[in-house]
């Protein structure tokens, strides 16, 4: 059974079409009108081995906030839908990723209880036209709609591009681990019997 989802979300601010295949090969087709986010989603798919297609249009003439946040929302929704009842998944995942001088870690629990711990202090700067404070908005939207507990920690690093890239790669690798099916797991990985 394919663990996939196709989501379309239309608001007055954004129009987003997204398809996700959890058991993919890391192939991506990304067009969000936000070049830096395209880059991050491309490497997210690659390092998580998810097949991901995103087409998004938003009110970027105002700024990128709505588009970035809403893509996080739709990606989280797609993961939740693709995982279904979560039977057989490992549930937990973690990754520590270096990117030159940067070291970032992500630990996640696909518990159904959304919570973001974001220990990534970034200067209020732009990478190209991208406000780096939107990284937090992306992950907040993701966890809220995926039902994931996500702890994102920057241990050290200076280059803002490297920091954000390490965070996205670590998130992808942790989610790949958490979504893996394990034949030893009967039902769900919870003493409650439900996630």
Curated annotation (Swiss-Prot):
InterPro entries, per the entry:
IGPD_sf (IPR038494), ImidazoleglycerolP_deHydtase (IPR000807), ImidazoleglycerP_deHydtase_CS (IPR020565), Ribosomal_Su5_D2-typ_SF (IPR020568)
Family membership: Belongs to the imidazoleglycerol-phosphate dehydratase family.
| PROSITE patterns to which the protein is assigned, alphabetical | IGP_DEHYDRATASE_1 (PS00954), IGP_DEHYDRATASE_2 (PS00955)
A Pfam family found in this protein is IGPD
Q: Which residues form the signal peptide?
A: none
Q: Looking at the UniProt record for this protein, which Gene Ontology cellular component terms does it annotate, in alphabetical order?
A: cytoplasm
Q: Which SUPFAM superfamilies match?
A: Ribosomal protein S5 domain 2-like
Superkingdom of source: Bacteria
Q: In which pathway does it act?
A: Amino-acid biosynthesis; L-histidine biosynthesis; L-histidine from 5-phospho-alpha-D-ribose 1-diphosphate: step 6/9
| Catalysed reactions, as listed in the record | D-erythro-1-(imidazol-4-yl)glycerol 3-phosphate = 3-(imidazol-4-yl)-2-oxopropyl phosphate + H2O
Q: Name one GO molecular function term.
A: imidazoleglycerol-phosphate dehydratase activity
GO terms (BP aspect)? L-histidine biosynthetic process
Question: Which species is this record about?
Answer: Citrifermentans bemidjiense (strain ATCC BAA-1014 / DSM 16622 / JCM 12645 / Bem)
Q: Establish whether keyword Protein biosynthesis is in the entry.
A: no
**Location of the protein in the cell:** Cytoplasm
Q: Report the EC code(s) recorded for this entry.
A: 4.2.1.19
Q: Which gene encodes it?
A: hisB
Keyword Chloroplast set for record: no
Coiled-coil ranges (or none) = none
Keywords (alphabetical) are:
Amino-acid biosynthesis, Cytoplasm, Histidine biosynthesis, Lyase
Taxonomic placement:
Bacteria, Pseudomonadati, Thermodesulfobacteriota, Desulfuromonadia, Geobacterales
Q: What is this protein called?
A: Imidazoleglycerol-phosphate dehydratase
């Amino acid at each position: 059974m394919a663990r996939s989802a196709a989501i379309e979300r239309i608001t007055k601010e954004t129009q987003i079409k997204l398809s996700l295949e959890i058991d993919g090969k890391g192939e991506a087709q990304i067009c969000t009108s936000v070049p830096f986010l395209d880059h991050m989603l491309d490497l997210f798919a690659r390092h998580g081995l998810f097949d991901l297609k995103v087409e998004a249009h938003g009110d970027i003439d105002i700024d990128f906030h709505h588009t970035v946040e809403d893509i996080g929302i739709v990606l989280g929704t797609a993961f939740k839908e693709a995982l279904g009842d979560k039977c057989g998944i490992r549930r937990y995942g973690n990754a520590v990723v270096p990117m030159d001088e940067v070291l970032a870690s992500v630990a996640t629990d696909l518990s159904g209880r959304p919570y973001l711990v974001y220990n990534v202090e970034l200067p209020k700067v732009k990478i190209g036209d991208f406000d780096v404070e939107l990284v937090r908005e992306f992950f907040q939207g993701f966890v809220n709609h995926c039902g994931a507990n996500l702890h994102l920690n920057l241990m050290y690093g200076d280059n803002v591009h490297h920091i954000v890239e390490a965070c996205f790669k670590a998130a992808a690798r942790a989610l790949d681990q958490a979504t893996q099916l394990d034949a030893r797991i009967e039902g769900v990985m919870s003493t409650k019997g439900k996630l």
